[in-house]
Amino acid sequence: VALLAAEVSGYRDRRATPRFAHEAGAALLLFEQLHDVRLHARHGRFYFPEDEMHRFGTHPGDLLAAQTTDRVRQLFAFQAERIQEYHRRALDYLPDVDRLDQCSLLVRLELAMALLTEIAEDGYRLLEHRISLTPLRKLWLAWRRRRGERRRFRRLPARE
């Protein structure tokens, strides 16, 4: 989906920006799987790799529990680190010349990372309750990201 969004938004750097979109898409997909883990588990969908669940001493049934155990919390923290790594790589790939064009994807990443921070600060208690950002906070984050990208774009050297 992120690759399609990048194509629709347009870009100049044919090598780096598709890589950005790939990494951003992976970050967003993994984030969605973590954020909605309780909902997915209730529908019999378990997206975490078996070897990683085994590594933390967990199994799919643990994701159906009403309480987040320490082991499950560690698994969630590990997944969050992976998401953050994809996010960092995505931003590293995105060239300045394409940042404004890719602003919608940057906003989606911004919102996901803000929510991931909230999840971490809550102790990864994703099995107990759903964590979300208020609409006003979402608006603020999106506006701030868009404004920052417009300012950055204006500072770029003249384009031909």
Feature annotation, model-predicted:
Residues 2-28, 34, 38-160:
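Catalytic cores of Mg2+-dependent Asp-rich isoprenoid enzymes
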